[in-house]
C-alpha cells in the first residue's frame, strides 16, 4: 500500500536519525529549485532526511534534502513519484577480509565496465543508472554492483583510496582495477580505471573526450584524446575498503 512520504516523515517527527529505503530509481539535484542533475540513485538505496525538519514541513516544497547511506552523498530529490519505506539498519560487523574481497572482484568489475562500453552510450553529467554515465558515476556503479561502496565524486574517491603514487612517466606499478585521477593542482575532476597494459576505461565528455565510455592509453600515442588526458594525470589510487557509515569520516 502506497504511503505518502510526507505522512511517513510526520510519523517520525522528521527525524534525521531514521533511515529510509527507496523503492524507485530517482534523480538527485544540486539545489532545491533548478533541474541540475548531480546523480541518479538506484532503487533500494538507503537515505536519511536532512530537510525539512518538523518546524518547516508546513511550507510548500517539492524537494527534500537527503543524505545517502552507502556513500554519504547529499542531494535534493523530488517528492513527486517518490516511494519509500522505513529501514532498520543492521549492526555492521568488521569485515576482516575486505581487502581480499575487493581484490577478488576487480576482474569482474572490469568485465562489467567492458560490457557497458559495448552498449550504445553517451556521457551524461550525473549519470549512474546506465547506459549513460559520467566519469565517477561509471566507477561508483561498477563497484556498487559488486557490493563495494565508494564515494560519488572523483575528488572524493581520490581521498578515499589508498594513494599509490603521483604520475611522472611510469605506470608499471599499476594493477588492473587501480583508479587513475586527472585534473590540476587544485582539484581532481576526472577518473578512470586501469585495465592493464597501459590502457584504462573512462567515461569522458564531448569537448575533450569520446562522449561516452572509451578505452585510452597511458603509452606514447598520437591519439589526441589519450594525449589530452595523459597531460592531466595527477595520481593513482587503490580501493582497499568499502565505505561504511559508522567508520568513514564524513
Where are these regions (language model features)?
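Short, well-ordered loop/turn sites that connect or cap secondary structure elements
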Residues: 14, 41, 173-174
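SH3/SH3-like beta-barrel superfamily modules
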Residues: 2, 38-82
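Aromatic- and glycine-rich peptidoglycan recognition patches
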Residues: 1-10, 15-30, 35-38, 166, ...
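A generic structural signal for residues embedded in beta-strands
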Residues: 22, 49, 181-182
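Surface-exposed beta-loop interaction hotspot
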Residues: 84-123
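Catalytic cysteine-centered active-site loop
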Residues: 119-175
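...with weaker cross-activation on analogous glycine-rich loops/strands in unrelated enzymes
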Residues: 151-221
